[in-house]
């Protein structure tokens, strides 16, 4: 078995865990490699280009927060991904640092279960396709002279056209990310839906809408000038021209996250979003 390891190199705790993990793997003669950035930060010569990892590795380990897991999952190509939470929030990273060894034991022995998560696929007019686990984000861009109008079609039927700072299309997994911050609903992970969430719309009647994930969404920006950022999981991938149409639908590829059977979704929401009746006192 061979592992691909991604590390949040800005966190000393993640780097420390990476060193402990490699010692654990070496002691068991289990092969591993890092992505180039992680290897450089650790001074390790065992690395491969990110695009090659899925061909040579059997499983992926993300040491960091949800951002590190998103990066690892982008290159996993449906290989199992185990997330060790060294971040602040950790909706996706299933295991704490103390649980890492149990998770690794289960992964090596094959005694683990999987949470399968849907992805989004955005196709440009050029034919290029991009994928994301959390969301596809259309933004107005800094050069726009006036608030642009975003036109949305569902299965080629007009849903609406309205002025806003942007539009988020999120999976159920991504509903607790940017979409939630923009006023979108929280959606249970196994729900077969997407949510379309406007960012600061210039109209009180414009609200997020939940749609079936078998729908095809087409979005264009109605503006006379400017370039408009297209982001996948928060990372800018393209600048769109005015009127350029992007087609978004469910990707045929999915992400397999190694499940922590001790985690309960309601408990996660209570803890991460402070929904408990017990609130910090500041003492």
From Swiss-Prot:
<keyword id="KW-0418">Kinase</keyword>
<dbReference type="GO" id="GO:0046872">
    <property type="term" value="F:metal ion binding"/>
</dbReference>
<feature type="binding site">
    <location>
        <begin position="66"/>
        <end position="67"/>
    </location>
    <ligand>
        <name>NAD(+)</name>
    </ligand>
</feature>
<dbReference type="Pfam" id="PF20143">
    <property type="entry name" value="NAD_kinase_C"/>
</dbReference>
<feature type="binding site">
    <location>
        <position position="165"/>
    </location>
    <ligand>
        <name>NAD(+)</name>
    </ligand>
</feature>
<dbReference type="GO" id="GO:0006741">
    <property type="term" value="P:NADP biosynthetic process"/>
</dbReference>
<feature type="binding site">
    <location>
        <position position="145"/>
    </location>
    <ligand>
        <name>NAD(+)</name>
    </ligand>
</feature>
<dbReference type="GO" id="GO:0003951">
    <property type="term" value="F:NAD+ kinase activity"/>
</dbReference>
<dbReference type="GO" id="GO:0005524">
    <property type="term" value="F:ATP binding"/>
</dbReference>
<keyword id="KW-0547">Nucleotide-binding</keyword>
<keyword id="KW-0067">ATP-binding</keyword>
<dbReference type="InterPro" id="IPR002504">
    <property type="entry name" value="NADK"/>
</dbReference>
<dbReference type="GO" id="GO:0051287">
    <property type="term" value="F:NAD binding"/>
</dbReference>
<comment type="function">
    <text>Involved in the regulation of the intracellular balance of NAD and NADP, and is a key enzyme in the biosynthesis of NADP. Catalyzes specifically the phosphorylation on 2'-hydroxyl of the adenosine moiety of NAD to yield NADP.</text>
</comment>
<dbReference type="GO" id="GO:0019674">
    <property type="term" value="P:NAD metabolic process"/>
</dbReference>
<dbReference type="GO" id="GO:0005737">
    <property type="term" value="C:cytoplasm"/>
</dbReference>
<keyword id="KW-0808">Transferase</keyword>
<keyword id="KW-0520">NAD</keyword>
<feature type="active site" description="Proton acceptor">
    <location>
        <position position="66"/>
    </location>
</feature>
<keyword id="KW-0963">Cytoplasm</keyword>
<protein>
    <recommendedName>
        <fullName>NAD kinase</fullName>
        <ecNumber>2.7.1.23</ecNumber>
    </recommendedName>
</protein>
<keyword id="KW-0521">NADP</keyword>
<feature type="binding site">
    <location>
        <begin position="134"/>
        <end position="135"/>
    </location>
    <ligand>
        <name>NAD(+)</name>
    </ligand>
</feature>
<dbReference type="Pfam" id="PF01513">
    <property type="entry name" value="NAD_kinase"/>
</dbReference>
<dbReference type="InterPro" id="IPR016064">
    <property type="entry name" value="NAD/diacylglycerol_kinase_sf"/>
</dbReference>
<dbReference type="InterPro" id="IPR017438">
    <property type="entry name" value="ATP-NAD_kinase_N"/>
</dbReference>
<dbReference type="InterPro" id="IPR017437">
    <property type="entry name" value="ATP-NAD_kinase_PpnK-typ_C"/>
</dbReference>
<comment type="similarity">
    <text>Belongs to the NAD kinase family.</text>
</comment>
<feature type="binding site">
    <location>
        <begin position="176"/>
        <end position="181"/>
    </location>
    <ligand>
        <name>NAD(+)</name>
    </ligand>
</feature>
<feature type="binding site">
    <location>
        <position position="163"/>
    </location>
    <ligand>
        <name>NAD(+)</name>
    </ligand>
</feature>
């Amino acid at each position: 078995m061979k592992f691909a390891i991604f590390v949040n190199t800005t966190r000393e705790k993640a780097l420390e865990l990476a060193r402990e993990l490699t010692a654990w793997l070496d002691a068991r003669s289990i092969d591993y490699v890092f992505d180039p950035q992680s290897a450089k930060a650790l001074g390790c010569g065992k690395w491969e280009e990110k695009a090659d990892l899925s061909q040579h590795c059997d499983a992926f380990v993300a040491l960091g927060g949800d951002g590190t897991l998103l990066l690892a999952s982008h290159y996993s190509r449906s290989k199992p991904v185990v997330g060790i939470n060294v971040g602040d929030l950790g909706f996706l990273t299933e295991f704490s640092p103390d649980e890492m060894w149990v998770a690794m034991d289960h992964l090596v022995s094959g005694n683990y279960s999987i949470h399968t998560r849907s992805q989004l696929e955005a196709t440009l007019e050029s034919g290029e396709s991009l994928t994301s686990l959390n969301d596809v984000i259309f933004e107005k861009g800094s050069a726009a002279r006036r608030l642009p109008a975003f036109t949305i079609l569902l299965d080629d039927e007009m849903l609406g056209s309205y002025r806003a700072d942007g539009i988020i299309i999120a999976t159920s997994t991504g509903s607790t990310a940017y979409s939630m911050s923009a006023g979108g609903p929280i959606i249970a992970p196994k729900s077969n839906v997407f949510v379309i969430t406007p960012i600061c719309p210039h109209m009180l009647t414009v609200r997020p809408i939940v749609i079936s994930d078998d729908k095809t969404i087409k979005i264009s920006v109605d503006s006379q000038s400017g370039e408009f950022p297209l982001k996948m999981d928060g990372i800018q991938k393209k600048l769109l021209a005015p009127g350029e149409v992007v087609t978004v639908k469910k990707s045929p590829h999915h992400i397999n996250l190694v499940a922590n059977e001790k985690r309960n979704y309601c408990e996660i929401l209570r803890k991460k979003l402070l929904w408990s009746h017990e609130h910090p006192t500041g003492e």
